[in-house]
Every structure is written in C-alpha cells, then in structure tokens.
Amino acid sequence: MPRKGPAPKRPLVNDPVYGSQLVTQLVNKVLLKGKKSLAERIVYGALEQARDKTGTDPVITLKRALDNVKPALEVRSRRVGGATYQVPVEVRPDRSTTLALRWLIGYSRQRREKTMIERLANEILDASNGLGASVKRREDTHKMAEANRAFAHYRW
C-alpha cells in the first residue's frame, strides 16, 4: 500500500460567468469524455432556463437545490465477526456536496425531457422545491441510516 497519504485538495477556480465555485464543481461533474466546453454550455443553459422560470439568481436556486439534496447521514459497510453491518455515519461537508451534485446530475440524465439542458434545469428546480428523484434519494439514504441506527456503536 502507498504510504504517501491522501492527495492534497487542489483549489477550485471560480466560475467565469457566475463567480461561484459551486458552478465550477457542477461543470466538472457534468463533464464527459473531456468535453468541457459542452459541459459548460449545458450548465450555463440550464442555469439560464432556471433564471427564466423562477426570475431569481440561478446560483441561489442551485444552492437551495443542493441544500435539499445534501445528505447528513449515510451507511457504510463494516465487517464484524463474519457479519457485515450497515453502519450509519455522518457525511463530511465536502462529501455531502459531491454526493448532492452527483445525484442531481445522475437523476437529470435519467429524466424524459428532450435536451440535457432542460433535464438539468428541471431537476435543479424540482430539487429547490423539495421534489424530484435526487431529493428522494437523500430521503432514502436517511431512512436507511435511521433503520440501521442500532449499529451506530460500530462507528469508526
């Protein structure tokens, strides 16, 4: 096993249009096969649609959506004496943001709208209103953690 320790976190540059690191993270998560300009077009288009539909700042809408999707608890597998338990643990803030973005994009890709811009915009709007598949995923994660609360003493 390598002994160098974890790789250092690299600083994220602010997004050129909105000046937000959150938008930069979103662009990097939408990115597929190195096509960053396409990812930027999708994200900016989705944020513009969100602005048109709500009439508010799209970064605020995105933050509200992420707050509704971010998990506070998750379960992690822990093997104890031949049995594997699902142990509920708290989620670090950076991981909760990453998970929220991943779920938001994953469920927007599964939606039925015609373009990815529409899908992402509608998923962001749904999440900001407390609806949508990504919010349901968070609720399911919390339910799973609550159901396995008995194993919380196995935390590490």
Swiss-Prot record:
One example GO MF annotation: rRNA binding
Gene Ontology CC entries for this record: small ribosomal subunit
Superkingdom of the organism of origin: Bacteria
UniProt xrefs under Gene3D superfamilies: Ribosomal protein S7 domain (1.10.455.10)
Keyword Transmembrane helix recorded: no
Matches recorded under InterPro entries: Ribosomal_uS7, Ribosomal_uS7_bac/org-type, Ribosomal_uS7_CS, Ribosomal_uS7_dom, Ribosomal_uS7_dom_sf
Pfam families linked to this entry: Ribosomal_S7
Single GO BP term: translation
Keywords, sorted A to Z: Ribonucleoprotein, Ribosomal protein, RNA-binding, rRNA-binding, tRNA-binding
Summary of the function given for this chain in its UniProt record: One of the primary rRNA binding proteins, it binds directly to 16S rRNA where it nucleates assembly of the head domain of the 30S subunit. Is located at the subunit interface close to the decoding center, probably blocks exit of the E-site tRNA.
Assembly notes: Part of the 30S ribosomal subunit. Contacts proteins S9 and S11.
Similarity comment text for this entry: Belongs to the universal ribosomal protein uS7 family.
Protein name per its UniProtKB record: Small ribosomal subunit protein uS7
Species this chain originates from: Mycobacterium tuberculosis (strain CDC 1551 / Oshkosh)
Encoding gene (name): rpsG
